[in-house]
Design a protein with these regions (language model features):
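Conserved beta-strand elements of the Class I
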Residues: 12, 131-135
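Short helix-loop-beta connector
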Residues: 125-131, 207-208
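NAD(P)-binding Rossmann-fold cofactor-contacting core
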Residues: 150-169
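N-terminal Rossmann-fold NAD(P) dinucleotide-binding loop
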Residues: 141-142
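Glycine-rich Rossmann-fold phosphate-binding loop(s) that bind the pyrophosphate
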Residues: 16, 136-138
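Rossmann-like adenosine-cofactor binding region
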Residues: 165-218
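Phosphate/diphosphate ligand-binding glycine-rich loop within oxidoreductases
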Residues: 4-124
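Gly/Ala-rich phosphate-binding loop of Rossmann-like dinucleotide-binding domains
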Residues: 145, 149
């Protein structure tokens, strides 16, 4: 029992690529400063199908963060999903619970993206900012959209692909941009190593009253 309690717990991040991520450095410094017997690793897997191999190879792995492009792709591999994550349709946190047998593993998915985004954007929401444009339609976009609607903000989705639920960048007019005072980049554009890329958005229509939020932190 003592050896089990003293065993260093392992946590990590799955995604591809991971060259832009500072999660490993951040969490390992946090574990050390808080005197937590744990380690954080990056698992740069090229296919989500490699997830179970990672879990089998590291028996002390207790949890994972999930980043692009697997926040939606990981769903079929989960044993259960938190209600909020289920409503969002994307997961960025996995809790790993192991039973007595090697193949007895339970994976429960959660979404903390929506919590972090909501807390950071809420102080800037006012009566003049009741409509938002969210650029992108992936897992990050779903979390952002969920959070904005929780704050009572109307959301317009913008994508390169036209659909019944989205507008394309070519369709955006000055009046539409002016009406939506919150603009969120939830696309992977700008992510390392392609840091000079950005959405094909009509930036000339932005004004001083707009709140622009970029999820790409590098």
């Amino acid at each position: 029992m003592d050896s089990f309690q003293n065993e260093k717990k392992l946590y990590g991040l799955i995604g591809y690529p991971l060259g832009h991520s500072f999660s490993m450095e951040y969490f390992n410094e946090k574990f050390e400063s808080e005197n937590i017997n744990a380690e954080y690793m990056n698992f740069e897997i090229e296919d989500i199908g490699d997830l179970m191999e990672v879990i089998a190879e590291y028996p002390n792995l207790c949890g994972l963060n999930v980043t692009y492009p697997y926040k939606e792709q990981v769903l079929p591999y989960l044993t259960s999903i938190d209600d909020a994550a289920k409503a969002i349709g994307a997961v960025n946190v996995i809790k790993i619970t192991r039973g007595p047998k090697d193949n007895d593993v339970e994976l429960r998915g959660y979404n903390s993206d929506t919590i972090g985004f909501m807390k950071s954007v809420e102080p800037f929401v006012n009566e003049n900012r009741k409509k938002a444009m969210v650029l992108g339609t992936g897992g990050a976009s779903k979390a952002v959209t969920y959070a904005l609607r929780k704050l009572g903000i109307e959301v317009m989705l913008v994508s390169r692909q036209k659909s019944a639920a989205t507008h394309t960048y070519d369709e955006l007019t000055k009046a539409m941009v002016n009406e939506h005072k919150i603009i969120v980049n939830a696309t992977p554009l700008g992510m390392f190593p392609h840091t000079d890329t950005c959405p094909d958005f009509p930036y000339r229509f932005l004004g001083k009253s707009h709140l622009c939020y970029d999820l790409i932190y590098n």
